[in-house]
């Protein structure tokens, strides 16, 4: 829907999933670059770097045609999880994993690579719920950044790399890290609700409570 402007029918969805599975692989240039990044790298920096190297290896046509841009968007949709998981497994345990799994979905593919085994369906469902919520996010800083870069006539890889840079900031995607730290304070849902209500009443809000909308 975000890339092609409409929801697919059953046959189109099957074909699209097949296409995305074909695009999960990474060129050797990207793999080599990922292997140079230290384990202490921020995951957003890793993805930004992966997108930049991918753009150098498989550049967009100078005419920026719509069909080509959609193909690039599909490739990034399919391979960003591969970029992150390959770097993580290599940098933390020295494993050169196969990023081309047969998993039926983006969430299943990423979780399989991250943990090395097919994930439970409950994990996949949770991952997809999270991805859908992010896709529903309004006109935020990273979207704004991507549009500004696109408005200069730059290529799609630059747009996405810039958007990732904006998303990395503590007042945007970095707020999720703050939210996770908040969640770790609590042992039970009741404890969480009571504390959050108290914080709201006292006007004590974390950055994760109110990210900027552009």
Residue ranges and their predicted role:
Residues 1-214:
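Hydrophobic alpha-helical bundle cores within soluble ligand-binding/oligomerization subdomains
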């Amino acid at each position: 829907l975000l890339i092609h402007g409409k929801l697919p029918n059953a046959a189109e969805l099957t074909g699209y999933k097949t296409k995305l599975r074909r695009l999960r692989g990474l060129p050797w240039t990207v793999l080599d670059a990922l292997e140079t990044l230290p384990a202490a790298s921020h995951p957003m920096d890793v993805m930004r770097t992966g997108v930049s190297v991918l753009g150098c290896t498989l550049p967009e046509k100078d005419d920026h045609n719509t069909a080509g841009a959609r193909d690039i968007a599909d490739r990034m949709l399919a391979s960003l999880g591969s970029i992150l998981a390959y770097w993580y497994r290599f940098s933390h345990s020295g494993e050169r994993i196969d990023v081309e799994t047969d998993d039926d979905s983006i969430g299943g593919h990423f979780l399989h690579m991250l943990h090395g085994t097919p994930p439970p369906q409950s994990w996949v469902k949770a991952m997809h719920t999270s991805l859908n919520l992010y896709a529903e996010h309004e006109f935020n800083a990273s979207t704004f950044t991507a549009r500004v870069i696109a408005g200069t006539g730059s290529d799609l890889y630059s747009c996405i790399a810039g958007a990732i840079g904006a998303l990395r900031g503590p007042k945007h995607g970095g707020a999720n890290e703050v939210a996770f730290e908040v969640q770790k304070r609590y042992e039970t849902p009741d404890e969480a609700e009571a504390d959050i209500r108290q914080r709201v009443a006292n006007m004590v809000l974390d950055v994760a409570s109110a990210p900027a909308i552009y």
